[in-house]
Regions:
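ATP-dependent adenylation/nucleotidyltransferase module used to activate substrates
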Residues: 1-147
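Gly/Ser/Thr-rich active-site loops/lids in small-molecule metabolic enzymes
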Residues: 150-153
Length: 153
């Protein structure tokens, strides 16, 4: 039978071990969307190394109706510091420049924002002695519905 407590403790220990091997003393950088995947990943990180070593990054694309959920998760659920970096203007500027050069496909419109979030996470990570945390779930990994080096870090 599946033992949730053991699986949770195994994940927490894995995070501690991975951090020790890949960046002793580093911070863990988590993209916080307000969804379950980023919440669980961030909570495991907090349990593993403490809230003071976990930094949330909230990255709306222009306006986001449910952005308060992400803020509440950081402030009241996790107790972590967070940054808000709106990727909307970068998204708009890149799309405008692409439109000048070629016809932008719907796939490009869909996938650009997650890729901008990925680059943002790595920029934050590099500036905060951090490592980017994978917030994908197994089903997303299995079907390939993730952003390489982004939520699939």
């Amino acid at each position: 039978m599946f033992n949730v407590k053991k699986a949770t403790n195994d994940c927490i220990q894995w995070i501690r071990d991975w951090r020790e091997e890949n960046g002793p003393g580093c911070n863990l950088i988590v993209g916080i969307s307000g969804g379950v995947d980023s919440l669980v990943a961030a909570e495991l990180c907090v349990e593993a190394i403490g809230a003071d070593k976990v930094l949330g990054v909230i990255m709306p694309n222009r306006e986001q109706d449910d952005i308060d959920v992400a803020y509440d998760i950081c402030q009241y659920v996790l107790g972590i510091d967070y940054l808000t970096i709106n990727v909307g203007s970068a998204y708009d500027n890149i799309i405008d420049q692409m439109d000048l050069a070629f016809n932008v496909t719907d796939q490009t419109l869909i996938n650009l924002a997650p890729r901008l979030r990925m680059a943002t996470l790595y920029g934050v990570s590099q500036s905060h002695n951090g490592r980017v945390v994978n917030t994908c779930n197994l089903s997303e990994d299995y079907i390939g519905y993730s952003t390489r080096y982004g939520d699939a870090a």
